[in-house]
Amino acid sequence: MKKVIIRKTEEIENWKRNINNEINFIPTMGNLHNGHIKLISTAKNDNSNVNLVSIFINPLQFDNKLDLENYPKTIDNDIKISFSNGADAIFIPSNEDIYPPNNKNIKFLKAPIELSSALCGLNRIGHFDGVCTVVYRLLNLIKPKNLYLGEKDWQQLLILKNLVLKEKLNVAIKSIPTQRDFDGIPLSSRNVHLSKNERKLIRFFSSELLEAKKNFQQEKNINLNEIIKKLSAKKISIEYLEHLHPHTLQKARLEDNISLLAGAIRCGETRLIDHVFLMKRRPIIAIDGPAGSGKSTVTKLIAKKLKLLYLDTGAMYRALSWLLLKENIDYKKEKKLLNIFKDISIVFKSNTNSHQDVYVNNCCVTEEIRSQKISSIVSKISSIKEVRKFLVEEQRKIGESGGLVAEGRDIGTTVFPNAELKIFLTASIDERAKRRKSDKQSKDSQEIDLDTLKELIEKRDFEDSNREISPLIKANDAIEIISDGYTINEVVDKIIDLYNDKIPKETEIK
């Protein structure tokens, strides 16, 4: 594809007609650095879409005329960097192109107060209004498939996600982690203004945040006053330093697993921001739903794609049921049940086909626990108070450090009520019966009556939903996905998109 530079808004439509492809859009204000390069190269490697970089210094984002005049302008080098790192086209409009004089159709937007009044919004009055206005204008001109943004400007990222949702814009936001320079400070177009001594101060500020992140993993708490004291001792001018919820930007709560430690300081005439995410444990995805909804297949694929542990809690109940049958133990007798808990070992192991096998007391029972015989009793056994108590404790032990995706019927309500993402995956009884029939026929040649399967599923649903202990219900904060008419991969992609929207990419960096 021929690389092009577009300078007029009216040329955008002509260019779009000629490319016959979806667009990845990377908006910038120029003076490109390695952070921008990471955005462009990520877009290039993500898919086969056309990559469009814009270079526009938006006057509405500046509350200080001198700051606008002093903003670095390196257009020739920016063009070279963009094209050499994967841009197919560059859009370099003028102020008059973006904000035509006397054009009453331009929509000047206000950023949501709940997100824009904290952090940078405290002193940069109108800044985020300007961001919303220009991005809304650009998105409506370009109509990209994907919008690539950096997590360095986390508050801005939250505000733009809100904009896309509120204005019902058909674009997916893809974020990349904060990119840091050789000395640990976040890459910024304003770094060129720093003297050697000022850069030293920024480095100290960033290192204190990173040290706080490291300490938080051990101590699970943060002492803001101690950090402020250290920064003040270095004569660093602190604009703000806050410990907040990463999505609401309200004060962090004790129960928050992921929180945001964000600060802004001034070095001479230059104002710079940095942040880290604090985590008590790695994220957890909880997927609940009725039998035959596709939970196991979906959860396995999500675990593989996100490199998370796959915790099949249903298999644990089935494994225990299998052992009770094998040992001919009457599960209605509490004493015998308690005795078997002392000796049972349920272990998951990856096999040579990249699948997970289930072992009970060193015996592989992967296939046996999926038999109709086990299916007919597992709901009854899983409703026994002592059984649930024992296995929930085992599941929580596995999840103490997080980093897993678990599926079952009470994951989001009982086992991991503080999971970062809760999904309630379901489908119609007809759809679930068809899936079960297909699944069983692929494993054996025995003909299975569809109506019989429907009856069995309805019976299992009733038992699961009406049991006294941990019934199958949708958690209040769970997102329901009805999978009728969707492929497995479409459901998986939907859940991964929801995960990426909730979990900052930076949390994946060790």
UniProtKB/Swiss-Prot annotation:
Any one GO biological process: pyrimidine nucleotide metabolic process
Which positions does UniProt annotate for beta-alanine binding? Q61
Q: In which pathway does it act?
A: Cofactor biosynthesis; (R)-pantothenate biosynthesis; (R)-pantothenate from (R)-pantoate and beta-alanine: step 1/1
Compartment(s) where it occurs, according to its Swiss-Prot or TrEMBL record = Cytoplasm
Question: What is the E.C. number?
Answer: 6.3.2.1, 2.7.4.25
* Spans annotated as Cytidylate kinase: 277-510
Which reaction equations make up its catalytic activity?
A: (R)-pantoate + beta-alanine + ATP = (R)-pantothenate + AMP + diphosphate + H(+); CMP + ATP = CDP + ADP; dCMP + ATP = dCDP + ADP
Per the Swiss-Prot or TrEMBL record, the active site comprises: H36 (proton donor)
Q: Which GO terms describe its molecular function?
A: ATP binding; CMP kinase activity; dCMP kinase activity; pantoate-beta-alanine ligase activity
Note the InterPro entries from the entry: Cytidylate_kin (IPR003136), Cytidylate_kinase_dom (IPR011994), P-loop_NTPase (IPR027417), Pantoate_ligase (IPR003721), Pantoate_ligase/cytidylate_kin (IPR024894), Pantoate_ligase_C (IPR042176), Rossmann-like_a/b/a_fold (IPR014729)
* Pfam families xref list: Cytidylate_kin, Pantoate_ligase
Indicate where this protein is primarily found. Answer: cytoplasm
- Homology family: In the N-terminal section; belongs to the pantothenate synthetase family. In the C-terminal section; belongs to the cytidylate kinase family. Type 1 subfamily.
User: How is this protein named in the record?
Assistant: Bifunctional pantoate ligase/cytidylate kinase
In its UniProt entry, the species of origin is given as: Prochlorococcus marinus (strain MIT 9215)
